[in-house]
Regions:
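Single conserved hydrophobic/aromatic residue that forms the stacking wall/gate
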Residues: 1-9
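N-terminal small-domain helix-loop-helix segment of the aminotransferase-like
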Residues: 8, 12-100, 107, 288-291, ...
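Conserved core segment of the aminotransferase class I/II
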Residues: 54, 228-304, 400
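Helix C-cap/helix->beta junction micro-motif
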Residues: 136, 199-200, 230, 360
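PLP-dependent enzyme catalytic core of the Aspartate aminotransferase-like
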Residues: 230, 346, 354-364, 370-406
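Conserved glycine-rich beta-strand-loop-beta hairpin in the small C-terminal domain of fold type I
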Residues: 286, 302-311, 329-342, 374
Length: 406
């Protein structure tokens, strides 16, 4: 069977088809999977851009790995990237370095709230948000997204407003674009969220780490770009790590236009000791944003091809499967993570994922981790060579065929 990919690049400069052996590299993704094919945690099976590898090699060859500063060139790299790619003009002074988006979020939950206050999240959503809230003495307040049963999520505005209006709710963590459902929030939606949070005195943390991994032809809207209210009442978390597959290098930024809020966040990150770069963080960030854009464009096209192939394979499977064993792929235009509805088969995908890993040697993320109606879903990472993705889906289909929820 051949598939025509809508975003196939006929003459690629970069290789995304060759499998790279990650054994011996202490990879979380592979070590946790054991003998299973790992299609769970969100890192990619591609070497990072050669421009980044060359810069890191040069830094490595220097041989001295002492303490690092954050140079003005780091701020400027973010400013130039967001202006060029996302039409957002960032004040360099509004950027603060952090060792990661998650450490920054956890630190801000501690500093911007008092104990037992509510932090609102829109579920199903990135599971580590729950950890950042609970581990820092606050309460998770879920405003579940509405699911129409046929592949589309939307915001329950009445529920969102009632929960933001609770005086105990002081912080909202927004996922933009949204992981795991892959939704790119449009400007009107973000404006309405911003207005509600402003009216009810709720600060917004916008996690925008997936912003550069949109399908070709689709652009995300930075929360801070929507209007002055959104800008002055928010902290935006941004990083090159998801985009360029360098999560292990621990480099990120928070962008805070409001100087009063910025000082609080700066104090939080420094108090928690997550504001100093390691010896490779600056080198990797500068090479990513200043030199690696062509690699990213080819990556996005390749990922879009993978997603198109995944949809074609699911359609082919469904055409031959019994109705009670069919699955549905959620429509999405961001991230390399697919959110797959398995509710016809089971309402406990933890059991399904266990079966798939044990009996068919493929590992996905069980949806219940993400809250909301996630128990009906699995999350599949397709950032891998197409042949590996195809093998993973064939194992999935075999597992769906012989799964029993009893």
């Amino acid at each position: 069977r051949s598939t025509l990919f809508p975003y196939t690049t006929l003459f690629r400069s970069y290789d995304f088809d060759t499998s790279v052996d990650r054994s011996g590299t202490y990879s979380l993704k592979w070590e946790e999977a054991g003998d299973a094919l790992p299609m769970w945690v969100a890192d990619m099976e591609f070497q990072t851009a050669p421009q980044i590898r060359a810069a890191l090699q040069q830094r490595l060859d220097h041989g001295i790995f002492g303490y690092s500063i954050v140079p003005p060139a780091w701020n400027q790299a973010y400013v130039d990237w967001w202006h060029r790619r996302h039409n957002l003009d960032i004040d360099p002074e509004s950027l603060v370095f952090s060792t990661g988006v998650v450490p920054a979020i956890s630190s801000m939950v501690r500093k911007l709230t008092t104990a037992n206050e509510n932090v609102l999240i829109q579920t199903p959503v990135y599971n580590i948000f729950f950890n950042s809230i609970i581990n820092n003495g606050c309460r998770v307040l879920e405003s579940p997204l509405k699911y129409d049963g046929s592949g589309h999520y939307s915001i329950n505005w009445a529920d969102l407003e009632s929960k933001l209006a609770d005086p105990q709710t002081t912080l909202m963590i927004l996922c933009n674009p949204h992981n795991p459902v892959g939704r790119i929030w449009d400007r009107d939606t973000l404006a309405r969220i911003g207005e509600l949070c402003w009216n009810h005195h709720v600060t917004v943390i916008s996690d925008e780490i997936h912003c550069d991994l949109t399908d070709p032809g689709y652009d995300y809207v930075p929360f801070a770009s929507v209007n002055e209210q959104c800008a002055m009442n928010s902290v935006t978390c941004m990083a090159p790590t998801k985009t360029f597959n360098i999560a292990g290098l621990n480099t990120a930024a928070v962008m805070i236009p409001n100087p009063v809020l910025r000082h609080k966040v700066w104090r939080a990150l420094n108090t928690d000791e997550v504001a100093e770069p390691n010896a490779f963080a600056m080198t990797a960030t500068l090479a990513a944003f200043n030199e690696s854009e062509p690699w990213l464009e080819e990556l996005r096209a390749y990922l879009a091809g993978n997603k198109a192939e995944a949809r074609a394979m699911i359609n082919e499977y469904n055409a031959a499967a019994a109705p009670e064993r069919r699955i549905a792929l959620i429509e999405s235009h961001a991230t390399y993570l697919l959110w797959v509805d398995c509710s016809k088969l089971t309402h406990d995908t933890a059991l399904l994922c266990e079966h798939l890993k044990r009996n068919h040697q493929v590992m996905f993320s069980e949806g219940a981790e993400y809250g909301g109606n996630g128990h009906d879903f699995i999350r599949i990472n397709v950032a891998c060579p197409r042949s590996i993705m195809q093998e993973g889906f064939n194992r999935l289909f075999a597992g769906l065929h012989d799964f029993s929820a009893e």
